[in-house]
C-alpha cells in the first residue's frame, strides 16, 4: 500500500498506464494468449495482516492463506477442475433462466440491476483463441456479467475495503440513477474514490456485476 500519495497522482498514473498498456491488454482481454493474475506476498502486506508476529512468521502465514485460497492442495489441478465445474454449473443455471433484473439488498444496499438482452454469465475459467482452457484470476470465486448500462438504480454500500492504486477506500456508498453514479461518500479515501469515479464519463457507470458465495476460502480468511 502506498502512503500519503496524492489521489490526483494515482488517478493520473492509472490513466497513463492504461494508455501505455493498451497493446498488452488487447492481447490479454481478447485471450490471444493465456495469462493469469496471482497474489505474491510482500513483507509490508504480511505485517499489515499479522502485526504481532515476526516478519518471517507473517510471510509464512500469508503464503499459507494464499495457497489455501488458491487451492494449492495435494492435487491442485484436480481441485481447480472441480472448482471450475462448480462455477460453470452456476453460470449455466443463470444463462438458462435469462433473468431480466437482479436485486441486491442489505441493511443499506438497495440496488436494482437490469440485464441486457442476450447477456451471458461467465466464471473462473476461459479459453484462449486456440480453445485451450485457463484461469486468468487465481484465486477466484465469482460469476460475472455485463449489466445494462442505463439500467442500474438505487444505493450500493461496500462490505469490504477497496484498495485502489495503493490507497484504501473504505465504508463507501454509491448512488445510481439510470446507470450513472450521481452521488457517493466514503468514511476513508473519499478523495481517491472521487478521482476514480471522475476519471472520465465511462467510469461513472458499472462495467461488470458479480455474484460470490458468502462463504469461500477467500471470505473465510476474514483478513
Where do the model's predicted regions map?
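Short solvent-exposed loop/turn micro-motifs enriched in small/polar/acidic residues
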Residues: 95-97, 165-167, 202
Amino acid at each position: 500500500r502506498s502512503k500519503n500519495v496524492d489521489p490526483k497522482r494515482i488517478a493520473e498514473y492509472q490513466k497513463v498506464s492504461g494508455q501505455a498498456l493498451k497493446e498488452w491488454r488487447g492481447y490479454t482481454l481478447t485471450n490471444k494468449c493465456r495469462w493469469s493474475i496471482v497474489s505474491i506476498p510482500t513483507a509490508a502486506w504480511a505485517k499489515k495482516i499479522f502485526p504481532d508476529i515476526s516478519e518471517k512468521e507473517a510471510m509464512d502465514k500469508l503464503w499459507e492463506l494464499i495457497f489455501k485460497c488458491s487451492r494449492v492442495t495435494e492435487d491442485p489441478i484436480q481441485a481447480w477442475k472441480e472448482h471450475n465445474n462448480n462455477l460453470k454449473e452456476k453460470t449455466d443455471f443463470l444463462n438458462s433462466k435469462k433473468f431480466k433484473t437482479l436485486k441486491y439488498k442489505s441493511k443499506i444496499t438497495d440496488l436494482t440491476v437490469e440485464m441486457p438482452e442476450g447477456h451471458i454469465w461467465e466464471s473462473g475459467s476461459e479459453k484462449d483463441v486456440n480453445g485451450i482452457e485457463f484461469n486468468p484470476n487465481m484465486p477466484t470465486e465469482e460469476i460475472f456479467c455485463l449489466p445494462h448500462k442505463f439500467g442500474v438504480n438505487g444505493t450500493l454500500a461496500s462490505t469490504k475495503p477497496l484498495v485502489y492504486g495503493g490507497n484504501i477506500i473504505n465504508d463507501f456508498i454509491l448512488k445510481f440513477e439510470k446507470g450513472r453514479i450521481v452521488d457517493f461518500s466514503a468514511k476513508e479515501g473519499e478523495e481517491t474514490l472521487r478521482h476514480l469515479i471522475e476519471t472520465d464519463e465511462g467510469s461513472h457507470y458499472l462495467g461488470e456485476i458479480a455474484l460470490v458465495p458468502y462463504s469461500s476460502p477467500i471470505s473465510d480468511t476474514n483478513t
